[in-house]
Amino acid sequence: LTKIKKLYYDGKKKALLISATGTGKTFLSAFAIKESNSRHILFIAHREQILLQAEKSYREILGKIDTGFLSGSEKNISADYVFATINMLAKDDIMRQFSPTHFEYIIIDETHRAGAKSYQKVISYFRPRFMLGMTATPERTDDFDIYKLFDNNIAYEIRLQEAMQENLLCPFHYFGIADIEVAGMIVDDNTHFSNLVSEQRVQHIIEQAGFYGYSGERLRGLVFCRTVDEAAELSHKFNERGFCTIALSGIDTQGSRNDAISRLEQPERQGGLDYIFSVDIFNEGVDIPAVNQIIMLRPTKSPIVFVQQLGRGLRKEKEKDYLVVLDFIGNYSNNFMIPIALFGDNSYNKDNMRRCISDGKNILYGPSTVNFDTIARKRIYEAIDKAHLNDVSLLKKAYEDLKNKLGKIPQINDFSYFGTIDIMRYWDKFGSYHAFLQKYEPNYNVALTGVQEEILQFICKRFARGKRIYEIELLQILLEGKEDIFTVLTAALAQQYHIGLPDTVKESVINNMTNVFTISNEREKYRHCVFIQQTDSKYVISDVFRACLKNKAFKNELIDVLAYARNNYQNNYYDTYAETDLCLYQKYTYEEVCWLLNWPHKINPNAMAGYFYEKNTRTIPVFINYIKADAKRVAYANKFLSDQRITAYSKLNRRIDSPDARHIYNADNENNRLFLFIRKPYEDKNTKEFYFLGDIHAIGRPVPAPRFNGFKIVYELMTPVREDIFDYLLS
């Protein structure tokens, strides 16, 4: 309210309020009007029912006010407070009965609809002193810029997850339930109508709804279906089984909808309703606080729609302690959107998505819970695995949403600051953010040379994820033009991060900064990526890099990349493990393991598979693809015996007396150090990242595995696997 008031008295003409369903947007707008001392008010919505609820709320806050409606049932243009449906107001003969300056204050509810011609017509005509737009979901699928419409003035923003933290909404218990097979076919995006309404499926839905129940004296539920016909037929079949339900669609009158809502809300079941079946007419703008159970029988096509439908039951009500949400999960291609919608994680990072599903109960704030049955969880994992999260259309959409919100081309740090898609998705797809902008942003006029683009992409690929700080800080020192660079680096590391620069690490940094670490087939591709050169007895900035930094645009882009890398390091990689540059439970590629263990050269991934002994550092990273045993490979599947022991197998064609076996079982005597890295093999097949689980040592000697033509060995982990990671790996 304070921010809206400030914008108003600062002379701003428009503002946008982004607030989750159920958090009191309408009440807030009434308080804002009261603060403004405005006399003539216009409240616009797309449905009459929203107007009726808004008018009631305004009377609660403002007392005895002169109100009237412009809708299909009433045409009052003389009231001080006019509540109008957009369809009625947009008619020329109605709108022009008001002068453009008649209303001092205009409220537009569900403002994400304002891209429509009817809204544009009304907004262009009126010239109020102040216009306030209200929505829970400003992002749109038609690329219309809602933020720009309101001059990019965001009065306040509180999304679903923040609203839950602030205890503004009713807690919910979400259950992801596997939809059943009908006639031997899993329900999916193309399931035939007859199977969607089959007796078998209806019985399954009823049984699950009864099992999970509701909070309150009686059941009051909303059921969201994929088609109008499905809603009607399911309602009919529920009624045949003793329920009192109705199906509503866009063809039903406002009076019919109001009557159905009243029957759902009434205290007595006699003459009331247990469920209302619909497709999308209750997605937004309708308050039914009494709803205590929501059933979702359609695929999650959009996180926005998911949150809208979930929000129908999140308004607090004294007769319910919580909302029950039942999501029947079929074999849908868009199942990967469920963790995005539920947890508000817009990073589009597959690992984050999987962790949300496996550890959802520990992620949501407060008493709300999320649970998936085994089959539903498996279907979501499969959808995540198949999802193309570097898809250009997805990246462009996420970019446009953020650009619209800011009213300018976003900088790299804006993506993390505003909690949108991870900037690394752009690096993975295009090599750099600059390359993406150059291709898809018409207002981006920055030009770099081929050498500068090569260097930028190398830094984004190798260092920008912030998995080690040494190279990041050294690049920053080079940018600042400082001399005696390793002396300056040593001081910076001690002062800012309280770490030293051991000789082994320094040598590794030099190898990285002179392109020695890179294997031969990549060396030509990044031949200009030499950042330092040796002059006499010390290292200085290379001639190539010095020349590149003369380009201000290149330098600024690099500053942004390094700022992101530094921030990511501090947030995710600062707490390193036992005299290494690795962090427990973070994920690393083969290349990153070579680099972070200070190996002189990168090793070909094919040679790394399984394990690899590096003689200079005496380190042996053990890489395990954790595959659940099946009938064909049960005898030779890697297997956790506990959270601190795992059975693993050697590479092919190895004997128990082979050198690699000796390096493993005789590690203590040889002063070798073994580390465990583990992944599920379906995870991001292109990157092949492994969770780091710390030091391990062999228990006893290897045992021959003749059918495998190798050996078996049991490892003990020095640190028991953290519970959520352990559960995820075994799930």
Where is each model-derived feature located?
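Long, largely alpha-helical accessory region at the distal end of helicase-like NTP-driven motors
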Residues: 215-216, 227, 342-474, 481-485, ...
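Conserved interdomain linker/interface between the two RecA-like ATPase lobes of SF2 helicase motors
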Residues: 154-222
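Post-DEXD/H (motif II) to motif III coupling segment of the RecA-like Helicase ATP-binding lobe
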Residues: 113-173
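Conserved helicase ATPase core of P-loop NTP-dependent helicases/translocases
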Residues: 52, 69-70, 74-77, 94, ...
